[in-house]
């Protein structure tokens, strides 16, 4: 073709532009249907809701009719019916003449071609299609966010994903990709395999899923914590509990998480936590039984359970049943025969049984006894039933085997005791009565002959006299009281024929025994064999008395003496004195330098015997007192001199008895005590260290300010008007005196110094108070003295003129008129050794009889006749 002219090209372009505008206008005016969203292919995830809107684009919307949707099977989709039921797919008219396709939950089956159709002006059919393509979004079907593998095992960290198209999976640990080049981690379709899980494998794992076609990416965070299977680390194989007592046992387990522990009784498969008396702590595994029963015996299983697994271990509970003696009978056997006593007990374990005599601690051993082969202990055990038997056999039994026996049942739980009695029967026996004295009677007094027969069983007793049974004599003077085992024969000896022998005969099933008894006539004692003076003083006389040479049955109850002055021939006026046989025979109240006559007799139950052993004895003249006797018990070691030990270190109380005054009353005592030492057994006094004191009217003296752990020789002398007695001497030792040393260290001042300081302090305080009163208020002793010192002479004269004109000073009241002290024997400190001259009577005085007596405390002077102390018979 040739080239067009330039104006032709412009015309062509104008024509082309007009044609396009015409075509566009034509299209705008033609009716169509539009579907929103406008994409012809809609990709939507399964399970999600979907809405598609069909809108007519026509010149006249009112000419549109039959607007509807058709599904992928070309079925008309109906509108939603009335009510709550909602179909999976329905249509709904929207404002603006639009029709919406509503899909509540998209499924794979709903994918396909959908059409929207309508008619326009009843002449033209309108249709618009849209394709719905479904896909499955990434969905975690099995991917828990917390997963717990077990230590030492292989574990798959689950991460199951559902998606369409299929996703790709990769793993991260603590934010870092996991390398699968080694055998530790293996990616599987259902998760991540971890081989031989260790605690170091714990952490945060990320399961990441991606769909390339859809560009979807989703992550799942999984926390992995390694669990450890339970392990029982402490449970004894055997447990022991005591019946009736509380019990506790531990089943200790470890694991992760902390395992829960339970106890199962194998016999019943019962969890003991639900049983009575049982308590279980599931955290610590402690099982407690408030009171163990014998039925609790058996095997128990300890279960330790956590999310990693279960482990169990068995143990046996042995119940120690305390022994119980359920049979022990008293037994009886005859002498010389065999006797066996059996004790039966139960317990777990079966108790050991032994015996012992009541009141002793020694137990019999199994088998024959070493110290007594007659006794054998036979034990027997039944462990299955928990029972034991012990038999104590005594062959050739003796009377000494009779008595109480204690059965002892013993096991680990405790001891049980029960007492039984073995009775050994024997024939009557009178051996205990062979040493009894005869029975005495006198003056027809009734006598009691008692017969006691020892025997088991009790014996019956008969009395015989002169070969005949007394019960057959019908003698009213013979009365039998009791027939056994004790029987008394009351004899009324109205004539001498009843003073004779009687026979007691005892009988039981094992034999007979006889015992002879004598009834004798008693008489008064015979003459006293001897009575001689052993000690003479001016006022006392001590005798040694030997009883009658022959004793006529009854014992001596007392010795009597009659004494009178020898010049007096009448015994009816004599003095009487009696002594018990075990007392000193001392006659007191005698006159010095006087001769006396004495006679003696013995007394028993019958009466006083005849007087005899007549003798005369003179008392010596007045003299110094007898030697006083200290009332202390000395202690003698080996051959050394006896020593009296003081319980104190710094003082000692000397006590003595009042000696005989020998005719003159004792007026004082002289005590001399000297410290000393023993050198080679010889007593040596310390020079210039002796103390001498004299005391009156007392029989004790306390020596003070002594030195601890020191020997003292003490001499005691009594004094009367004649002189001093011979000295009584003892050696005394004080204790160590630790307490005295402690007191000396602490005590700075003596008691007198402390009292003086206290009085001085009080006086000083009074002086200060008086001085203050004088200065402040012009009162007090000092103020009064000052006022008197300042008075003028005229004031003094005026004061003197008051009253009677002079001051009268009354004399003090005279003391009570007391008699002057009586001086006995001259100066109290004089020490006459003997009587130089007789006593002189002052001129003009009347001579009267007088007595001076000393009763141990006071001196009494009496005038008049001297009367003896004892009454005359």
UniProtKB/Swiss-Prot annotation:
Residues 31-131, 138-223, 230-318, 323-423, 428-520 form the Ig-like C2-type domain. It comes from the Eukaryota. GO terms for molecular function: cell-cell adhesion mediator activity. The modification Phosphoserine is found at residues 827, 845. Residues 29-751 are extracellular. Residues 611-638, 804-847 are annotated as: Disordered. Residues 770-873 are cytoplasmic. Glycans are attached at residues 74, 250, 330, 448, 458, 576. The modification Phosphothreonine is found at residue 841. Residues 524-622, 638-738 form the Fibronectin type-III domain. It holds the Pfam family Ig_3. This is Fasciclin-2. It comes from Drosophila melanogaster.
């Amino acid at each position: 073709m040739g080239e067009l002219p330039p104006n032709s090209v412009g015309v062509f372009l104008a024509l082309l532009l007009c044609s396009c505008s015409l075509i566009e206008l034509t299209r705008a005016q033609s009716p169509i249907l539009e579907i929103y969203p406008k994409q012809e292919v809609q990709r939507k995830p399964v399970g999600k809701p979907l809405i598609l809107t069909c809108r007519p684009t026509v010149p006249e919307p009112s000419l549109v009719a039959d607007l509807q949707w058709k599904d992928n099977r070309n079925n008309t989709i109906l509108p939603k019916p009335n009510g709550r039921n909602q179909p999976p797919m329905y249509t709904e008219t929207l404002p603006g003449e639009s029709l919406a396709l509503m899909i509540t939950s998209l499924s794979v089956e709903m994918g396909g071609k959908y059409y929207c159709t309508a008619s326009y002006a009843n002449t033209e059919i309108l249709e618009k299609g849209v394709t719905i393509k479904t896909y499955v979004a990434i969905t975690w079907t099995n991917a828990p966010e917390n997963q717990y593998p077990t230590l030492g095992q292989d574990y798959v960290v689950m991460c199951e994903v559902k998606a369409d198209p299929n996703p790709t999976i990769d793993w991260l640990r603590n934010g870092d990709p996991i390398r699968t080049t080694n055998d530790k981690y293996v990616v599987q379709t259902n998760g991540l395999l971890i081989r031989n899980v260790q605690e170091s494998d714990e952490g945060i794992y990320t399961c990441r899923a991606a769909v390339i076609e859809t560009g979807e990416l989703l992550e799942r965070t999984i926390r992995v914590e390694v669990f450890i299977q339970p392990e029982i680390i402490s449970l004894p194989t055997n447990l022991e509990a005591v019946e009736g007592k509380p019990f506790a046992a531990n089943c200790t387990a470890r694991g992760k998480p902390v395992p829960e522990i339970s106890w199962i009784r194998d016999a019943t498969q019962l969890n003991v936590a639900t049983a009575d008396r049982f308590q279980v702590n599931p955290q610590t595994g402690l099982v407690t039984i408030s009171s163990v029963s014998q039925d609790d015996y058996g095997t128990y299983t300890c279960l330790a359970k956590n999310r990693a697994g279960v482990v169990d271990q068995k143990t046996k509970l042995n119940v120690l049943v305390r022994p119980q003696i359920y049979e022990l009978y008293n037994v009886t056997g005859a002498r010389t025969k065999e006797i066996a006593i059996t004790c039966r007990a139960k317990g777990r374990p079966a108790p050991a049984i032994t015996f012992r005599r009541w009141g002793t601690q020694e137990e019999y051993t199994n088998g024959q006894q070493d110290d007594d082969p007659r006794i054998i202990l036979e034990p027997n055990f039944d462990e299955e039933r928990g029972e034991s038997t012990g038999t104590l056999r005594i062959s050739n039994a003796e009377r000494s085997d009779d008595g109480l026996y204690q059965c002892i049942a013993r096991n680990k739980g405790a001891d049980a005791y029960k007492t039984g009695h073995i009775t050994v029967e024997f024939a009557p026996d009178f051996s205990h009565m062979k040493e009894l004295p005869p029975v005495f009677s006198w003056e027809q007094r009734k006598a009691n002959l008692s017969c006691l027969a020892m025997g088991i069983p009790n014996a019956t007793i008969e009395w015989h006299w002169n070969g005949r049974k007394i019960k057959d004599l019908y003698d009213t003077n013979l009365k039998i009281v009791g027939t056994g085992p004790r029987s008394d024969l009351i004899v009324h000896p109205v004539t001498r024929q009843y003073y004779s022998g009687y026979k007691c005969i005892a009988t039981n099933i094992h034999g007979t025994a006889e015992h002879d008894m004598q009834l004798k006539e008693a008489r008064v004692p015979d003459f006293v064999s001897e009575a001689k003076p052993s000690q003479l003083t001016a006022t006392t006389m001590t005798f040694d008395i030997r009883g009658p040479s022959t004793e006529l049955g009854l014992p001596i109850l007392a010795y009597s003496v009659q004494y009178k002055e020898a010049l007096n021939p009448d015994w009816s006026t004599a003095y009487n004195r009696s002594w018990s046989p075990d007392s000193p025979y001392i006659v007191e109240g005698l006159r010095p330098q006087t001769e006396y006559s004495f006679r003696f007799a013995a007394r028993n139950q019958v009466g006083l015997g005849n007087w005899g052993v007549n003798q005369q004895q003179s008392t010596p003249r007045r003299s110094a007192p007898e030697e006083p006797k200290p009332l202390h018990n000395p202690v003698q070691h080996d051959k050394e001199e006896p020593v009296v030990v003081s319980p104190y270190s710094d003082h000692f109380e000397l006590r003595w008895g009042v000696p005989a005054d020998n005719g003159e009353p004792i007026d004082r005592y002289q005590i001399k005590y000297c410290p000393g030492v023993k050198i080679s057994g010889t007593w040596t006094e310390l020079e210039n260290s002796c103390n001498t004191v004299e005391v009156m009217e007392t029989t004790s003296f306390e020596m003070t300010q002594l030195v601890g752990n020191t020997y003292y020789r003490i001499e005691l002398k009594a004094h009367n008007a004649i002189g001093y007695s011979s000295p009584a001497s003892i050696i005394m030792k004080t204790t160590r005196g630790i307490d005295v040393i402690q007191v000396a260290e602490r005590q700075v001042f003596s008691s007198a110094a402390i009292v003086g300081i206290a009085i001085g302090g009080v006086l000083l305080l009074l002086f200060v108070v008086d001085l203050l009163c004088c200065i402040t208020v012009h009162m007090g002793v000092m103020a009064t003295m000052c006022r008197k010192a300042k008075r003028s002479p005229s004031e003094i004269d005026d004061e003197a003129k008051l009253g009677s004109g002079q001051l009268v000073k009354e004399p003090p009241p005279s003391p009570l008129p007391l008699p002057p002290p009586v001086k006995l024997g001259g100066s109290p400190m004089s020490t006459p050794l003997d009587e130089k001259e007789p006593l002189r009577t002052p001129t003009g005085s009347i001579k009267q009889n007088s007595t001076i007596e000393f009763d141990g405390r006071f001196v009494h002077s009496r005038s008049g006749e001297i009367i003896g102390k004892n009454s005359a018979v």
